[in-house]
Amino acid sequence: MWKLKIGAETARGDGGGGGGSETWLRSLNNHLGRQIWEFHPELGTQEELQQIDDARRRFWERRFERRHSSDLLMRIQFAKENPSSANIPQVKIKDTEEVREEAVGMTLRRAINFYSTIQADDGHWPGDYGGPMFLIPGLVITLSITGTLNAFLSKEHQCEICRYLYNHQNEDGGWGLHIEGPSTMFGTALNYITLRLLGEPEDGMGAVEKARKWILDHGGATAITSWGKMWLSVLGVYEWSGNNPLPPEVWLCPYLLPCHPGRMWCHCRMVYLPMSYLYGKRFVGPITSTIQSLRKELYTVPYHEIDWNKARNDCAKEDLYYPHPLVQDILWASLYYAYEPIFMYWPAKRLREKALDTVMQHIHYEDENTRYICIGPVNKVLNMLCCWAEDPNSEAFKLHLPRILDYLWIAEDGMKMQGYNGSQLWDTTFAVQAIISTNIAEEYGQTLRKAHEYIKDSQVLEDCPGDLNFWYRHISKGAWPFSTADHGWPISDCTAEGLKAVILLSQFPSETVGKSVDVKRLYDAVHVILSLQNTDGGFATYELTRSYHWLELINPAETFGDIVIDYPYVECTSAAIQALTLFKKLHPGHRREEIENCIAKAAEFIENIQASDGSWYGSWGVCFTYAGWFGIKGLVAAGRTYKNCSSIHKACDYLLSKELASGGWGESYLSCQDKVYTNLKDNRPHIVNTGWAMLALIDAGQAERDPTPLHRAARILINSQMENGDFPQEEIMGVFNKNCMISYSAYRNIFPIWALGEYRCRVLKAL
């Protein structure tokens, strides 16, 4: 049976997969927030094992209708470890029945009682942060190349990865970019290769053969995207001459160039950094019999007859979210024909070697400053591969191995690689605000105390070492990360939400929620937020916007949009306004003028980027309902109202126009990729969208004008609650880079609690 381990206990043992040990793990705070799964064959009662088998069977049977796991393995474990003693009857409200405060209060207590049982001992809420389907392949390819696949991933790990891939294979035989997406060559070719590397035969369960047919029917693997071409090249089933150039020498260019990688969005920068190393070395792993076989399986013509030059720009129409503009094709052709032939030979090759050394310096800096977690799963495995390519026996490679487990999560649909090492801090700050909104927070002092400790101990206390300008890093001291302090990358909205949470908790007695954060640390957080405001008033994610929008012309990733620079977002900007406004109320004398100017500019930015129909586009959640919540909440925090601000007026009208006839809101991920509001299939409501819309409208004073939509939405949330106080997992609600969805599994609990809490206190009690 699989067991979730948290925090310090994760450093004991090897994660059940071999290769990891306490010797090769580093931590700033005793692994706070770390979450790994271990397999223990002796664990589990017959009843628990049957529960797990039943959950797996139900997922398989409904896999084409319900793509998202319900995170049941974790819930089964916590039900045994933290049983709830509360016995509050379930509430259901008929369509003709009035929503009463008593019913809302009972629903909230049942919800928080349950949610408290799935809180980890260290104070955060673990959960599934999967969704993308292109992450596990990079890991399996890297482990296969380095000869550590079977040594590091146990047969149980490999079995669960195969289960996950089979569960999320589409009916046509392919795999999408994410669990709810239609089949793409990127997803299908990579996951097909993954199954083969894991030992599945060419006709495995009929599904492998079906996947190969999809690949061949769509032109073969030469039509995979540029990221896919890179992975296939290092594996040895595609030639480097079929890639557009990624010259590492760009890292030697002066920073004043607008296209310098140091000016790019950090995720983009940190992915193309190791890619440029592998490209510059033309690195290829061992050519095994499986690799030889894959060369025959993946293409419509014999491998030696493929026109690799033509394949450089070949991309399946199913993958083409961001087609290459002409200027990009000209750039790649120039580098391919004129630049690369020179730098492959002496004397220019000496400059390449210098560039490769520089790239490896930056890779090691990233590794060391994230305790070998890295900023995300893509550069995690790429950096690990680069360390092995540099020296297979290096300490750096050994330090990478145990941190793989930080990214692996298991649910009833199998084992997946998450989009980060978790969403620990982010979810915890939202959970705190949700519980506090209910006005019954004192009843859950132990839950809040543990969450408070987690948030306090996850704040980044030091800047990265060395010259930050040389390493292209922003200040970190005082910031909060998305996940753990060991990860450590500072983020604007995480810092804002962390600051909001600790300020709100400071209003409670320390006997209830623990000691407040030292005021100097609040000042540090404010300093980070103020330092991240761009000249247009907006806030980006990790850093200031360092270059120009036109740089997107050289975005080589056909699958993703707006990845080259760190753009300002309504979500990040709103969070900054909210945090600074809250801070200013308690500490009015600290940098008052700077804070007021920052808030004013940020509010103006939010107004300026609003669409003419009253909407904002959500870049990190689905989609217009998510952004609408942030947009309205930010403007209200800045002092705007429905009466004196046309932006809030228009935003409310927009949200109300999207309310479903049955009540509530239900927005499809298609809104993100198509940039047009799209309802879920059959116009179903979604509890998370409904929660966001409710919170936005309540903040904008909808209860004073017409509370009817709020009553209907509250009824949806109350009636959605499950018998044990949990809420159902519905469609995927997270997004990044416009086109890829990601799971925020905690949202199903957080936002019904938050919305009903605000509804109870600000709507029902105001009537």
UniProtKB/Swiss-Prot annotation:
Gene Ontology CC terms: lipid droplet
- The positions flagged as active site in the entry are 493
Q: What is its EC number?
A: 5.4.99.8
Q: Name one GO molecular function term.
A: cycloartenol synthase activity
A biological-process GO annotation: tetracyclic triterpenoid biosynthetic process
Q: Where are the PFTB repeats?
A: 158-199, 522-567, 599-639, 648-689, 710-751
Q: Which Pfam families match?
A: SQHop_cyclase_C, SQHop_cyclase_N
Tell me the protein family, please. Answer: Belongs to the terpene cyclase/mutase family.
Biological function? Oxidosqualene cyclase converting oxidosqualene to cycloartenol.
Name of the protein this chain belongs to: Cycloartenol synthase
Q: Gene name on record?
A: CASBPX1
